[in-house]
Amino acid sequence: MAYFEDTIEHSRQLLFALEAGDAHEVEERAHAIKGASANICAGPVREAALQLERAGRNKDLSQTPQLYKVFKKEFQRLLEYLKSLPLPS
């Protein structure tokens, strides 16, 4: 599923942006994750990405380490849930 591959890549780039202190790139990557997550109705992942997007837009990265942890936790929860579903026949 393209969502997971794309979100993993955006997540990796988001982490690089956070480490570099690049607020604009944080906003861009989080925005992409937010939109893709909304498209598949992944509410908690979308909300976590929204918080990161806002931090980037406001150029206030002081809370982003914690926000990124929340995002990763919610994304991992989504992956685990989907892995638990039976495969279609």
What is each PLM-predicted segment?
Residues 1-32, 39, 58, 62-87:
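Long, amphipathic alpha-helical coiled-coil segments characteristic
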Residues 38-47:
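Amphipathic C-terminal alpha-helical segment
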Residues 48-57:
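Hydrophobic, amphipathic alpha-helical faces that serve as interaction scaffolds
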Residues 34-36, 52:
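A broad "ordered helical/assembly scaffold" signature
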